Amino acid sequence: MVFSSLVFLCVFFPLQMLVYYLAKGIEARNTVLILFSLVFYAWGEPFFIVLLLFMCFVDWAVSQGIYKYRGTGKSKAFLVLGCVIDLGLLAFFKYTVFILTETQSWFGFPSVVPKIALPIGISFYTFQLLSYMVDVYRQEVPAQPKFRRLLLYVSLFHQCIAGPIVRYKDVSEQILCRHVDSADMRNGINRFVSGLAKKVLLANVCGSIASRTILSGAAADQAANLPTLENASALTLWLGCFAYALQIYLDFSAYSDMAIGMGLMVGFRYKENFNYPYLANSITDFWRRWHMSLSSFFRDYVYIPLGGNRKGKPRQALNLLIVWFLTGMWHGAGWNFILWGLYYFVFLALEKFLIPGLQRLPAFFAHLYTLVVVFFGWVLFYFTDFTQGIVVLKGLFGLNGNPLINLEGRTMVLNYVFFLAVAVLACTPLPRMLYHKITSSTNGAAIALGTVLEYALPVAGLVFSISYLVGDSYNPFLYLQF
């Protein structure tokens, strides 16, 4: 089940909200959230609910030992035990097939590589559990004495399977006591619907454009008369890569919007996960704005404990290399993800050590540099097959013997130019700024317009999104695969 499915929008979520507000008292409401979260998670993968419960129980038990023996060697031993179990399970499910496949390719064994399904959300909830145990060890929060409360934190369907990666210390008090007023409910609904519209009306269409131009297969669907990657014009490939860059931001930020909105509706206040990353003026700035919960996790639980910026430039560079290798691996078990992480390490290291003068560049050129680096980074990220990725990188400049511009490319650009302009605007704060300017104005006409927009936009967004979904096929969020 995904947030943008009809069964979720029309059955699951309304039923959850109804039962939640019929329940009396915080413990009863927490129980409602736990039960619905477990149903949500088990909907597509009933078996892996056992894994989620097991990891949560083990870490709950381990955290009791960490807290009981705080300040002693036993506390660290409990922490190491919990981390080994969590990371061991994550590595088994996420990287075993990759490692065995590479071993088979290089050395001829094993003869058969087993098929191991990746549990949905394991990368996200594992990091949440790790952050909880480390924070207990650091005595930033006490261990949660009640298992069901930790289970609520880990399994809450708003953010369990695709983030944001929520810190226990940020929601520990909200688990015990929450209040929702009319403004919270209104803001939550607006945020949820805006995320839904962003996903269904923008991200999905961008994905459709990308799939028509840079399909992950070696050749496009010939039945649809689409070109092969080798023969596609440079203009067509630029269009497809640009559409994918828009899709991955709109899709992932839409999920975060919906999660934050649903949290507000029941009193949870999750931190923002995106801050208009395509407005960044450096790669360093980009990663302060993109998937902020993941970036801050690696900063606080890997980079700083390794020494951060405190032990000289060679050590800083090594720490940075480790973090970005792990960032690439976190996103997927594939050489392209590792290369993508190392690609960003190179540019971040250049900015940090060799070209700090980048900050003195005129804003336009700094922004252009950032967009170019990010654009080619998404090409590396998209293609799990290096051969296809190289074909596309060459094709972007006509180095495959492909035309730079052809009729098909011009036609596709003309067909999608208006839509892509709207999608680009959605990647900026301009729509939100305009909305707030209108709704906060003291001008009579603006007040009337603001009142209409405040109620009409969410309704219109919901109606158009559901109408689109009625005739659409399954449309999962991109980050569910990580």
Task: Locate each region found by the language model.
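Membrane-embedded transmembrane alpha-helical bundles that form the catalytic cores
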Residues: 1-481
